[in-house]
Amino acid sequence: MKEMKQLLLKKIKEKSIISGVVGLGYVGLPLAVEKAKAGFKTVGFDVQQEKVELVNEGHNYIGDVVDKDLKMLVDNGMLSATNDFSFIGDVDFVAICVPTPLDKHQQPDITYVKSSAEEIAKYLKKGTMVVLESTTYPGTTEELLKPILEAGSGLVCGEDFYLGFSPERVDPGNAVYKTKNTPKVVGGIGEDAVEVIAAMYEAVLDSDVFRASSPAVAEMEKILENTYRNINIGLANEMAILCDKMGIDYWEVVDAASTKPYGFQPFYPGPGLGGHCIPLDPYYLSWKAREFGFHTSMIESSMMINDRMPEYCVDRASKLLNARSRKALNGSKVLVVGVAYKADIDDYRESPAIDVIDILDNNGAEVDYYDPYISEYKNKGDVKKGLRDIDADTVKKYDLVMITAAHKVVDYGMIAKNASLVFDTKNAMKDYSGNDNIEVL
């Protein structure tokens, strides 16, 4: 066992280790690129043939990856992609970066993790380090992954291969913190595994590596990060609803509270939560808590508040149309600006704006959308195309404009000047908040 550790550490030091990344999405591709840039030959795997071909041609499809970096790494042979799991037999260190969504019953769906583990097990060789990076409930690494890998490979964890967990911390569109400079948390089954995982990430990243005492600690800390955000955004949404009823500007309240130099962190309301982590992760924790007879009442309350925000925003929009324009939502023309789940990115996973559009449509509104980063999106098997651009004449055609993502490149001054009515759920038009035609969440 010590010999296995020493060999892996030696390979890491010499940059002779071959790294594998399973899943080439928003998490996996940036990680694969950073490993290759650090001098480790890296092979990425994805079930989508299109992604494999794009990577092997040096074409980037992820906003947080620099195009020229990907092309250079592919051209010099440091990075390649495949859809054949047999590559696992050639790698020494493999990171699993696959989706962990919810099923139709809002229960954890770890199908991708399970199927990846089953395929990896078929080709797993002695001396390999396996790390799960997908966000999941505490216990997944030891209770699910370990038995699958051992049963499928005939190898013993800790003796023949190492296993650990290191949560991804990707924040799409963040201009400051990328994969390279975001601190990493690592947890392994056994101290030797932790040492190997930490050594690898210390060789790849320009950031601190925190060594957790177990995979469960590392799994729980990621859930804590996102549940913390979920709960505080839920509080902000509830406060915004109350402030509206009381005739108080919540955004001014937050600005005032933010002057306190300690003990307060601002959170802002919106049409709901989006992205792959924050709306979903608390469900993973709540589900796991029931195994221990524990009810996560605060967490579930915040989830309920956040999940209802798209409907609340449409209700506010309907009342606004009725009060200001004496029009019903049914038959009104509505332009939704921004379908990305947050500002300045092209990612619409779990975006509340899509729910807003669905609810508007179901209530009889004639809905179009504009997003400078997303020309079309898929939802429930259908494709909805957005407007290619908007100008004064375009905006004047609509009874209501709803702002659901605060993209900086949008001309809000033009909207403020020409829109009949605006409902701004993101305070994107704060510079024009004095206009009579604008109402803010």
Feature-to-residue mapping (PLM):
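Structural/interface elements that position substrates and couple domains in central-metabolism enzymes
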Residues: 1-441
